[in-house]
A protein has these predicted regions:
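Short beta-alpha connecting loops at secondary-structure transitions
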Residues: 76-78, 204, 289-295
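A short, flexible low-complexity segment enriched in Lys/Arg and Gly/Pro that occurs
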Residues: 21-40, 86, 221, 255-265, ...
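C-terminal substrate-recognition/cap domain of FAD-linked oxidoreductases
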Residues: 89-269, 273, 277
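Short, hydrophobic/aliphatic alpha-helical segments
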Residues: 32-50, 264-278, 305
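Activity-critical C-terminal alpha-helical subdomain
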Residues: 288-342
Length: 342
């Protein structure tokens, strides 16, 4: 909520910013309460101002959310294999701009992530593996696209139908529902591998950013180049949380680290690359303390400071650099280096 998060199904249902009706906060200047109406045109939106404050303006005590009908019987799963990343991105853009509705989960993996997914879900051991090779969907070039649709029966079916139509037009090979079901099965278990890997000094972490379609290829290329600058590093990327205007790019790296200082240096180079490439430094993970040094360079110097002075004049709420509000000048990164891509 206070990090402006987004769930895996946000392409259809929206992010937290789309489904909040009202909030209540306890702040140093008193209670802040917003009314819950479906929409208002009454000046600046206090709901949006408070969301993303990460505890620096006050403590969230209550929230009213929109709800949706849950109709799992209407879900339509899909998965396709594209020959390369560029073609897959073009198809994804067309799917999001064709005015045919959006799927609930919309996930496109780049070649490196596709390679790992096929092994992790044992697709390499099925008849699909030799068939892909025979048809020209080459390893470390091909890209996996998967997801599912939700909603009313006719709507869900029509969205899946149009995704199929566009995917085939861009030369994608239909895969079975096995791939999507395998992803769903391990969706919330795979991240726990992180703790086991750390016992062997192997670190895995994720960084994500919001990108316009016009800049998607460059951000993907530039950030991955920085990630791969560290020897023996696995870097996977997928596109998810998509919109007609762009999407979220999600970078995952796996590498061996000697200590926390090395991790911080590496992490910093990646965030520098994201900021300099013209992407938003966070789509849904928020800012916190780790991303805080880059925030002023992204939104400007005065905006958050003015709000902080009003809601928390003594700076008692969540101190220590959260969203960059009390950082020293020498701690700030990438000032005056933001690029805008329209």
């Amino acid at each position: 909520m206070v990090t402006r998060g987004a769930g895996q199904n946000s392409t259809y249902y929206g992010t937290i910013a789309d489904i909040v009706l009202s909030q209540k906060y306890a702040t140093p200047i008193g209670r802040i309460v917003t009314p819950h109406y479906p929409r208002e045109a009454t000046g600046p939106d206090l709901n949006q101002i408070m969301m993303g404050s990460e505890g620096t303006f006050g403590v969230l005590t209550e929230v009213t959310l929109k709800v949706f009908r849950w109709q799992p019987e209407n879900r339509k799963r899909f998965s396709y294999m594209f020959r390369d990343w560029e073609t897959a991105m073009a198809a994804a853009r067309e799917m999001m701009q064709c005015e045919c509705g959006y799927s609930s989960v919309f996930r496109l993996s780049d070649p490196e992530e596709t390679h790992l997914m096929l092994k992790l879900y044992n697709v390499d051991e099925t008849p699909l593996a030799p068939l892909m090779d025979k048809l020209g969907y080459k390893d470390m070039e091909r890209c996996m696209f998967l997801g599912f649709t939700d909603g009313e029966k006719g709507f869900s079916k029509n969205v899946a139908k149009n995704i199929h139509r566009i995917a085939r037009r861009y030369g994608a090979m239909p895969m079975t529902g096995y791939v999507t079901k395998s992803w769903e099965k391990g969706r919330f278990n795979d991240p726990y591998l992180r703790d086991t890997l750390m016992d062997f000094s192997v670190i895995t972490d994720t960084l994500e950013c919001s990108v316009n379609w016009s800049n998607m290829a460059q951000v993907h290329r530039d950030v991955r180049a920085v990630c791969h600058a560290l020897p023996n590093t696995i870097v996977t990327t997928h596109m998810s949380h998509c919109y007609p205007q762009g999407a979220n790019l999600y970078f995952i790296f796996i590498t061996r680290m000697n200590d926390a200082a090395e991790f911080k240096r590496y992490h910093t180079t990646i965030l520098d690359a994201i900021q300099k490439s013209g992407a938003a430094i966070s789509h849904h993970h928020g800012i916190g303390k780790m991303f805080a040094p880059w925030l002023e360079g992204y939104i400007g110097e005065k905006e958050y400071g003015v709000l902080k002075d009003y809601f928390d004049p003594d700076y008692t709420m969540n101190p220590g650099g959260t969203i960059g509000l009390d950082l020293k000048p020498e701690e700030k990164k990438c000032l005056n280096e933001r690029k805008d891509y329209r």
